[in-house]
């Protein structure tokens, strides 16, 4: 099966996903067969869009896949749109590939450095912002964070999260008397933990000179 990562407006359409899987399993497909397979879809219009985008090839009234399939990880960049076959040798390597992301903000000099997989399924703040922005499906854990934060402005959230985290410059434990969604979010993300006394402790590495927090 062909998997699409970081789909565009065209490639995230449900019909496109079904179409490429159909063409991947059938040879020398004609338009009539596609219309019969997808009777409730505006096939003519969408097929022209896919052909114009270079994703589908039409030759002698036959339709074929023309996807730029991933064959190597050498030039792979995070958030790049890719097409990859689950049966290919590069697929497993892709799942194991790791990337580093950095989050900065305009309020202070704090930096959040996080590790992620290519699909951004790992529970990090960067992944959350990315998926909400592009309306990608959330993992169960990311949905838990969404239930707290919702579609929050990233700069606004970072302002309050980093301001709280920087308090660990002077103290090892912090009290938060009132319920705070940003503090709750830091707990869900794994940046802080609440001890038996109800105080919060830092749960990640913190370079105090560089004001950098590392979420492994």
How would you label these PLM feature ranges?
Residues 1-9:
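Short, Lys/Arg-enriched N-terminal segment that forms or immediately precedes the first helix
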Residues 2-3, 42-44, 57, 164-171:
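Extended alpha-helical scaffolds
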Residues 11-33, 86-176:
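Short amphipathic alpha-helical interface segments
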Residues 28-81:
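N-terminal interaction modules that seed assembly of large macromolecular complexes
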Residues 37-52, 172-189:
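Short amphipathic alpha-helical interaction segments
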Residues 51-62, 183, 187-198:
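A short, conserved structural fragment
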Residues 62-68, 198-205:
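Minor-groove-contacting beta-hairpin "wing" of winged helix-turn-helix DNA-binding domains
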Residues 69-103, 206-216:
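Short, amphipathic alpha-helical interaction segments positioned at domain boundaries
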């Amino acid at each position: 099966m062909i998997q699409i990562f970081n789909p565009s407006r065209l490639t995230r359409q449900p019909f496109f996903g079904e179409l490429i899987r159909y063409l991947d399993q059938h040879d020398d497909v004609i338009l009539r067969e596609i219309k019969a397979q997808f009777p409730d879809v505006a096939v003519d219009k969408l097929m022209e869009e896919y052909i114009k985008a270079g994703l589908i090839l039409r030759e002698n009234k036959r339709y074929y896949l023309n996807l730029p399939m991933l064959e190597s990880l050498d030039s792979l960049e995070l958030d790049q749109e890719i097409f990859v076959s689950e049966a290919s040798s590069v697929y497993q390597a892709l799942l194991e590939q790791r990337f580093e992301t950095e989050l900065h903000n305009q309020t202070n000099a704090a930096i959040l450095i996080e590790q992620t997989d290519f699909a951004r399924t790992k529970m990090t703040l960067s992944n959350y912002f990315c998926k909400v922005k592009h309306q990608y499906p959330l993992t169960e854990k990311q949905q838990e964070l969404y239930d707290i934060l919702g579609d929050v402005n990233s700069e606004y959230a970072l302002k309050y999260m980093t301001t709280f985290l920087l308090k660990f410059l002077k103290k090892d434990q912090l009290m938060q008397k009132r319920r705070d969604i940003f503090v709750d979010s830091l707990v869900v993300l794994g940046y802080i933990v609440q001890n038996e006394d109800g105080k919060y402790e830092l749960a990640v590495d913190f370079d105090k000179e560089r004001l950098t927090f590392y979420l492994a």
